[in-house]
Amino acid sequence: MIIMKEAIIATHNPGKVKEFKEILEPRGYDVKSLAEIGFTEEIEETGHTFEENAIMKAEAVAKAVNKMVIADDSGLSIDNLGGRPGVYSARYAGEQKDDQANIEKVLSELKGIEKEQRTARFRCALAVSIPGEETKTVEGHVEGYIAEEPRGEYGFGYDPIFIVKDKDKTMAELTSDEKNKISHRADALKKLSKLLEA
């Protein structure tokens, strides 16, 4: 019998939970979302970096549930916009966290800008908090550029407008398997797996 290690993922975002499960479960983790453990408290994301926000979430939930917690803060950084939307990615177009409105705002701000000036990256900071241990962090990223219009049916967030470098596909045009090999979250999770196994 294989013993699974429980990992609580500090998010209410079903898209993120799905990615975590697809990447961590084959590595022997029993992944549970906040909803699955009945944690409904909203955690303020007041950090100035992805890493600060991930640490805040991981430590707050770990303290409440007394279990290992993995938290992620991730987003899109666009060079031509000075790194925006950055830590404000989820609420770029307003507090309602509307993916479509966020996409429309980015496309509007980049209207008429040439492809070479639309470079961007998805960044993901992961923090793992284990009661009684120091919180550890890793960061992953994937390079690309912003499309002129949304393409694809998969994924969530900015996936329909983020074209992966060296591919002619947006993240939303990639299958889960394809995305999980190259995404910023996959990159960070691979680093986190090595850290947890050390």
Swiss-Prot record:
Q: Which Gene3D superfamilies match?
A: 3.90.950.10
Q: Which residues cross the membrane?
A: none
Q: Which positions does UniProt annotate for substrate binding?
A: T11, H12, N13, P14, G15, K16, S74, F156, G157, Y158, D159, K179, H184, R185
Q: Which CDD domains match?
A: HAM1
Cofactor dependence is on: Mg(2+)
Q: Name one GO biological process term.
A: purine nucleoside triphosphate catabolic process
- Give me the Gene Ontology terms describing cellular component: cytoplasm; cytosol
Q: Which InterPro entries match?
A: dITP/XTP_pyrophosphatase (IPR020922), ITPase-like_fam (IPR029001), RdgB/HAM1 (IPR002637)
Record-annotated active site: D73 (proton acceptor)
Cofactor annotation comment: Binds 1 Mg(2+) ion per subunit.
For this UniProt record, the keywords arranged alphabetically read as follows: Hydrolase, Magnesium, Metal-binding, Nucleotide metabolism, Nucleotide-binding
UniProt: Mg(2+) binding residues: E44, D73
Tree of life domain: Bacteria
| Reactions catalysed according to its record | XTP + H2O = XMP + diphosphate + H(+); dITP + H2O = dIMP + diphosphate + H(+); ITP + H2O = IMP + diphosphate + H(+)
According to the UniProt entry, its GO molecular function terms are: dITP diphosphatase activity; ITP diphosphatase activity; metal ion binding; nucleoside triphosphate diphosphatase activity; nucleotide binding; ribonucleoside triphosphate phosphatase activity; XTP diphosphatase activity
Q: What is its EC number?
A: 3.6.1.66
The entry sums up its family as follows: Belongs to the HAM1 NTPase family.
**What HAMAP family does this protein's entry cite?**
Non_canon_purine_NTPase (MF_01405)
Q: Which NCBIfam families match?
A: PRK14822.1, RdgB/HAM1 family non-canonical purine NTP pyrophosphatase
Query: What's the subunit arrangement here?
Result: Homodimer.
Function of the molecule:
Pyrophosphatase that catalyzes the hydrolysis of nucleoside triphosphates to their monophosphate derivatives, with a high preference for the non-canonical purine nucleotides XTP (xanthosine triphosphate), dITP (deoxyinosine triphosphate) and ITP. Seems to function as a house-cleaning enzyme that removes non-canonical purine nucleotides from the nucleotide pool, thus preventing their incorporation into DNA/RNA and avoiding chromosomal lesions.
Under which name does UniProt file this protein? dITP/XTP pyrophosphatase
